[in-house]
């Protein structure tokens, strides 16, 4: 059962990575949801498998580090649960009725196919903009967000709505269809590859290193929710939207307040027929309980509010020619067939390939190479081959045969265990396909984030035998790089990219321990678990010396990840990788500043309101450097809440849960002496 859980969790994490980091998903929304539901059902049956690091407990983008500075949301920024049919929508409404009766009215909003963004206004001035990230911590994209036409630097004065001291507002960044088409046309004229769809282009444009590039791309934004507020407590969401509009923030003109489920369904049906009349892409309708007090009663899971749901429309379809089926070997050895097709427009973007998952799925769909096939964009995002148009066959089609040996190394393929639909290459150490994927993983943003070591560069280094595996990366020299055409000029000198690669590799040697742990490709160890292990043990050697039980006892790790870590370090060539990196100068231990006493080890502190003696960042830094956790929301696990001037809803939550509340003097004593600290009302 543990192995089944591990496989499911690994698949979910892989698809989350492809969606949130690469912007290149390979399965449909429905297929992903089915994987997640299977994982949830397994954890319900065997609760001991559920760990804080499980995909079922995290918001979709959790654990994928980026090149932008991390910033903590004032209040959690959650995802939405989905409904794909009337039955699922009715079941959700039934749960609402069971909890709060017939009193709930609903807001129906268009589900914009874009990128979530959180804005923070303090005293009416924009102070921060961040992406969703893992729901607690996102990327700071303030400079880029300021270039968006719809995002005001300062809120407008309103006679009817008092401006709040602090306003955290959530919304969606997107492209209008016409602007997206113009952007792609300009990219083609410049000889660059066009974006696949508006969502990908919005994500890429918002995360540009140069804000001037973002400014040229005509991004738009619509606000659709609130986070933390101080001095603003609307009774209903539609009243909140009126206030946002009065302050100059963009809100949708297509939002409708309705009384019951029948009216909800009517709005869903209407927009299903008129979706292309909107100037931006939509992939559904979001339904929310309007009453804020009822929202609080309904609460949320670890990843989504119970008072809202996204109804997803059936995807659009098109026909095209299936030119070939080829297989790809992934980082873990999984062999996946892919359909290569004549490029065709579906739901506003061009599709040329799609995953077929495994041989059983190819057989189930009944597709042959040479078929005319029906494809769709599930959730209007992910391409999927539905099946063949049998009537158009002319006899030239041929059956796809899954290889019995690895196309990369020739090793016989086999399922990991009897009954598995997936087959794998067991040659984990030296299979060229797996090697390329592992080298690429070392350089990825959620690992060591090494620029100039992309997929092409890694493949070139391996094919030229400059490196044998990822263990050789940090010992690379200028002479060795000159053996590859990719890093050699026509004059025979090292190229600028080659020099940058060597500099970036040298810089990566000083990366924090958690990034090194992620880069080692230990199964199940993402940034969340890696950070927990690095914080607890401080060095690779201490982690290796720890027992499985000691590893499992770390918050955020648990037995599954602990077993994977222990097993990984028992393999000889795994340990060789570590030692080669160590010998090349990669730091295998975090440096701790012993001059600052760790008075807050194991203590979780939430700060609300303004403190005269600390900025928000200074207060957080003071907590973290003393070994504590600076959290963004109050829960039963919160040790203390520090309340300054004009505290917000976090103060109320602390009172409700009985969490000790400190003023600034109490906070200073806590920093100096550690707990127990004397609680006191804010001054």
UniProtKB/Swiss-Prot annotation:
The keyword Ligase applies. The active site is at residue 111. Keywords: DNA damage, DNA repair, DNA replication, Ligase, Magnesium, Manganese, Metal-binding, NAD, Zinc. SMART domains: BRCT, LIGANc. The keyword Magnesium applies. Residues 595-683 form the BRCT domain. One of its GO terms (molecular function) is metal ion binding. Its cofactor is Mg(2+); Mn(2+). Zn(2+) binds at residues 406, 409, 425, 431. It catalyses: NAD(+) + (deoxyribonucleotide)n-3'-hydroxyl + 5'-phospho-(deoxyribonucleotide)m = (deoxyribonucleotide)n+m + AMP + beta-nicotinamide D-nucleotide. Belongs to the NAD-dependent DNA ligase family. LigA subfamily. DNA ligase that catalyzes the formation of phosphodiester linkages between 5'-phosphoryl and 3'-hydroxyl groups in double-stranded DNA using NAD as a coenzyme and as the energy source for the reaction. It is essential for DNA replication and repair of damaged DNA. This is DNA ligase. The lineage of its organism: Bacteria, Bacillati, Actinomycetota, Actinomycetes, Mycobacteriales. The gene is ligA.
């Amino acid at each position: 059962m543990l192995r089944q859980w591990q496989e499911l969790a690994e698949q979910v994490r892989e698809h989350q990575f492809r969606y949130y980091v690469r912007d290149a998903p390979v399965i449909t929304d429905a297929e992903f949801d089915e994987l997640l539901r299977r994982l949830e059902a397994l954890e319900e049956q065997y609760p001991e498998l559920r760990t804080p690091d499980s995909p079922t407990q995290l918001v979709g983008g959790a654990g994928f580090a980026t090149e932008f500075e991390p910033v903590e949301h004032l209040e959690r920024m959650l995802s939405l649960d989905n409904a794909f049919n009337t039955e699922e929508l009715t079941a959700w409404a039934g749960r609402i009725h069971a909890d709060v009766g017939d009193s709930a009215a609903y807001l129906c909003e268009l589900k914009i196919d874009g990128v979530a963004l959180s804005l923070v206004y303090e005293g009416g001035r924009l102070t921060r903009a961040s992406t969703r990230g893992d729901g607690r911590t996102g990327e700071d994209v303030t400079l880029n967000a300021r270039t968006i036409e719809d995002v005001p630097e300062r809120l407008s004065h309103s006679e009817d709505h008092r401006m709040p001291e602090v306003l955290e507002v959530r919304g969606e960044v997107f492209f209008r269809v016409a602007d997206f088409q113009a952007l792609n046309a300009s990219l083609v004229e410049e000889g660059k590859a066009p974006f696949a769809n508006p969502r990908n282009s919005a994500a890429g444009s918002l995360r540009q290193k140069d804000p001037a590039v973002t400014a040229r791309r005509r991004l738009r934004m619509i606000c659709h929710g609130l986070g933390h507020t101080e001095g603003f407590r609307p009774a209903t969401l539609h009243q909140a939207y009126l206030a946002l509009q009065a302050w100059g923030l963009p809100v949708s003109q297509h939002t409708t307040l309705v009384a019951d489920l029948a009216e909800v369904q009517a709005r869903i049906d209407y927009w299903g027929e008129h979706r292309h009349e909107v100037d931006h892409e939509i992939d559904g309708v979001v339904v929310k309980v309007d009453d804020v007090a009822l929202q609080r009663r309904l609460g949320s899971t670890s990843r989504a509010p119970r008072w809202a749901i996204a109804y997803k429309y059936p995807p659009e379809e098109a026909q095209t020619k299936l030119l070939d089926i080829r297989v790809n070997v992934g980082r873990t050895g999984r062999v996946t067939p892919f359909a290569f097709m004549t490029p065709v427009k579906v739901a506003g973007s061009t599709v040329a390939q799609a995953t077929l998952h495994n041989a059983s799925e190819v057989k189930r769909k009944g597709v042959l190479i040479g078929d005319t096939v029906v494809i769709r964009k599930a959730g209007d995002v992910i391409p999927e081959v539905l099946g063949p148009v049998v009537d158009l066959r002319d006899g030239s089609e041929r059956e796809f045969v899954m290889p019995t040996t690895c196309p990369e190394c020739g090793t016989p393929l086999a399922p990991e265990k009897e009954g598995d639909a997936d087959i794998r290459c067991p040659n984990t150490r030296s299979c060229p396909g797996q090697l390329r994927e592992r080298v690429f993983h070392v350089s990825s943003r959620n690992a060591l984030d090494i620029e100039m070591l992309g997929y092409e560069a890694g493949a070139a280094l391996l094919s030229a035998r400059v490196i044998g595996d990822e263990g050789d990366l940090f010992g690379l020299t200028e002479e060795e790089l000159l053996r590859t055409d990719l890093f050699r000029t026509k004059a025979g000198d090292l190229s600028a990219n080659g020099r940058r690669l060597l500099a970036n590799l040298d810089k990566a040697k000083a990366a924090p321990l958690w990034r090194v742990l992620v880069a080692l490709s230990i199964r199940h160890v993402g940034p969340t678990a890696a950070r927990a292990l690095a914080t607890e043990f401080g060095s690779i050697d201490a982690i290796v010396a720890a027992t499985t039980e000691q590893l499992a006892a770390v918050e955020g790790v648990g037995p599954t990840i602990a077993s994977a870590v222990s097993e990984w370090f028992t393999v000889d060539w795994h340990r060789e990788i570590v030692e080669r990196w160590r010998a090349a100068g990669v730091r295998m231990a975090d440096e701790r500043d012993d001059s600052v006493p760790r008075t807050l080890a194991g203590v979780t502190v939430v700060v609300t309101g303004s403190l005269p003696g600390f900025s928000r960042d200074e207060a957080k830094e003071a907590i973290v450097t003393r070994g504590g956790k600076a959290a963004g929301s109050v829960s039963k696990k919160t040790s203390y809440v520090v309340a300054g001037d004009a505290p917000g809803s976090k103060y109320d939550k602390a009172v409700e849960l009985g969490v000790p509340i400190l003023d600034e003097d109490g906070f200073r004593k806590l920093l100096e002496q550690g707990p127990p600290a004397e609680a006191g009302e804010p001054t």
